[in-house]
Amino acid sequence: MIFLIDHNLKGHALVFLGAIATQGWLDIVPMQFVTFAEMDLSINSDDRTVWRLAQENQMILLTANRSMEGKDSLEQVMREENTSESLPVITVSNADRLLNDSEYRGRCVESLVEIVLDIDTYRGARRIFIP
């Protein structure tokens, strides 16, 4: 599974992916994290553009801070464009704890792996908060 890492989680993603690898999950569940830069996506892109790019490329958007209000907010885009086949957006509930709390980070890893292993169950779910 490929994850599009929101620009506000770029540094966090390194720690997160390291925890996934340390726990041995990458040997069992192929996962790849890609950045906005790797996708030629501006960090100033609106949520509609980001969501569409992720869906078109079969990537799960991993974020901690996307807008909830406005015509191009992530929430509005998902209401308008989400289908039963859409991949969910995964939102880390507390990005600071992801960096600083190994127990919390471990729970985030478990949640992420569970979602990937059973991705078809989560299609169409719009947004999933972890942990």
Residue ranges and their predicted role:
Residues 7-26, 34-44, 73-131:
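Acidic, PIN/NYN-like endoribonuclease modules and their adjacent C-terminal/linker elements
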Residues 47, 55, 59-80:
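Acidic, metal-binding active-site segment of PIN/NYN-like and related structure-specific nucleases
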Residues 2-6:
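Short hydrophobic beta-strand segments
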Residues 1, 57-59, 117:
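Short coil/turn segments at beta-strand junctions that form active-site/ligand-binding loops
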